[in-house]
């Protein structure tokens, strides 16, 4: 069945806008933005590329290469933002602190930010970085949706069990405000669910047909 969610067409026409090292280099703070965050090597760039059907986000065998806020335009009012990857051991500490400082500035000041997509490697979920992002989202009343990436690396049963376990842990620690799903970029698993979240946050009517 062909997905008719209106966000699909917008994602397919996504174009690179600019890279920002600091908040004052970001596009005008208006419209709708959804940011993608994740610990290094969590599959963030691959997820973005799969959702947009393009090679917009840079992928690398060396985690942590994304050092800037990268903005991708969907239309005049809507953008996706690729946030810096964190946690890679070979990144110098001063650079890590620089990334952290500007990430906090972006998250804390951006009025157009409507939601945060957090990538977790399903084999290594709930890292310290993930917990920090969850804490921030709840404290800031920011909608968050989690993609348990690389779900194809596990059997379906093991992936489902991990989903339920992480879901229970999040509900216990942070309540029901955070949604979560399985995702695999190579297998294109979970695209419909992710598109529906994006459409909701960007105030696009969900026209996906009912089951």
Swiss-Prot record:
Coiled coil: none annotated. Its cofactor is Mg(2+). GTP binds at residues 38-45, 64-68, 82-85, 149-152, 182-185. GO terms for cellular component: cytosol. Keywords: Cell cycle, Cell division, GTP-binding, Magnesium, Metal-binding, Nucleotide-binding, Septation. One of its GO terms (biological process) is division septum assembly. Mg(2+) binds at residues 45, 66. Residues 30-204 form the EngB-type G domain. It comes from the Bacteria. SUPFAM superfamilies: P-loop containing nucleoside triphosphate hydrolases. InterPro entries: G_ENGB_dom (IPR030393), GTP-bd (IPR006073), GTP-bd_ribosome_bio_YsxC (IPR019987), P-loop_NTPase (IPR027417). GO terms for molecular function: GTP binding; metal ion binding. NCBIfam families: GTPase_YsxC (TIGR03598). PANTHER family: ENGB-TYPE G DOMAIN-CONTAINING PROTEIN (PTHR11649:SF13), MSS1/TRME-RELATED GTP-BINDING PROTEIN (PTHR11649). Belongs to the TRAFAC class TrmE-Era-EngA-EngB-Septin-like GTPase superfamily. EngB GTPase family. Necessary for normal cell division and for the maintenance of normal septation. This is Probable GTP-binding protein EngB. The lineage of its organism: Bacteria, Pseudomonadati, Pseudomonadota, Gammaproteobacteria, Pseudomonadales.
């Amino acid at each position: 069945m062909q997905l008719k969610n209106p966000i699909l067409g917008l994602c397919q026409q996504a174009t690179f806008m600019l890279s920002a090292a600091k908040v004052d280099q970001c596009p005008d703070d208006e419209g709708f933005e959804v940011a993608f965050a994740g610990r290094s090597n969590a599959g963030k760039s691959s997820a973005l590329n799969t959702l947009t059907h393009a090679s917009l986000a840079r992928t690398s065998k060396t985690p942590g290469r994304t050092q800037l806020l990268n903005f991708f335009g969907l239309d005049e009012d809507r953008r996706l933002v690729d946030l810096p990857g964190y946690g890679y051991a070979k990144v110098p500490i001063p650079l890590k602190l620089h990334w952290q400082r500007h990430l906090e500035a972006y998250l804390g000041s951006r009025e157009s930010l409507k939601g945060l997509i957090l990538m977790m490697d399903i084999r290594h979920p709930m890292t310290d970085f993930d917990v920090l992002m969850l804490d921030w989202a709840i404290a800031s009343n920011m909608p968050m949706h989690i993609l348990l990436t690389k779900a194809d690396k596990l059997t379906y049963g093991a992936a489902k069990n991990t989903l339920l376990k992480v879901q229970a842990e999040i509900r216990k620690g942070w309540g029901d405000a955070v949604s979560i799903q399985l995702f695999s970029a190579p297998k294109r698993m979970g695209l419909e669910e992710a598109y529906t979240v994006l459409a909701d946050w960007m105030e696009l009517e969900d026209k996906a047909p009912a089951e």
